[in-house]
């Protein structure tokens, strides 16, 4: 469920010297499964991800289009057979390019089997399981195309470990943002391994 939240100060309290805000929420969407991130356009269009389902968009008129799903999902215009979810891993961050109105570019962080190679047999190997995808969004907001995997080797945790909440996919990162300079910033999780933030050759446990 996604909410719109409005803060407003109570007039009587404000008049008495207290400025205590109250909160009003309205359900914008219901029935979602593990919604993870949102990216807004100036007109109110909202791209959003569901961790184990995929990428969708809520248009400024309120209609919803399912754009790009994960393996075995239904109802999406297209799907990536290499994309999967497990624990805290799945389709996570989404952000629109700063010049989206000109280039129609969208970035999405997801977990993928495409670049695993032979490195995912234990939690102590370099398991390249998280990627950043770049898409072009159609002008009618009904489909995405030209998937390009621009980051392919952010490490993923394939097996359970003895840490609290230590299942597969734990500490998976996934946040995407565009900075003031127009650069794309990517957060990779530490996958429950202290070596990740300390080893400069690994992308896990880093802000890229």
Question: Model features per residue range: what roles?
Answer:
Residues 1-5:
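Bacterial N-terminal signal peptides
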Residues 11-195:
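Acidic, Gly/Ser/Thr-rich repeat motifs that build Ca2+-stabilized beta-propeller blades
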């Amino acid at each position: 469920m996604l909410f719109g939240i409005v803060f407003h100060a109570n007039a009587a309290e404000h008049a008495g010297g207290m400025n205590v805000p109250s909160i009003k929420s309205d359900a914008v969407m219901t029935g979602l499964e593990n919604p993870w991130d949102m990216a807004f356009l100036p007109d109110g269009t909202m791209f959003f991800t569901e961790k184990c389902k995929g990428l969708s968009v809520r248009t400024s008129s309120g209609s919803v289009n399912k754009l790009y799903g994960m393996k075995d999902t239904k109802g999406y215009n297209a799907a990536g057979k290499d994309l999967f979810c497990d624990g805290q891993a799945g389709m996570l961050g989404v952000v629109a390019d700063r010049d989206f109105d000109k280039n129609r570019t969208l970035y999405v962080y997801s977990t993928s089997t495409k670049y695993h190679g032979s490195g995912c047999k234990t939690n102590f190997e370099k398991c390249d399981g998280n990627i950043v995808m770049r898409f072009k969004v159609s002008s009618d907001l009904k489909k995405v195309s030209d998937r390009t995997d621009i980051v392919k080797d952010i490490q993923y945790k394939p097996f359970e470990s003895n840490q609290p909440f230590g299942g597969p996919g734990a500490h998976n990162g996934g946040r995407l943002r565009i900075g003031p300079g127009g650069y794309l910033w990517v957060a990779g999780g530490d996958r429950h391994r202290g070596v990740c933030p300390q080893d400069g050759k690994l992308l896990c446990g880093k802000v890229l």
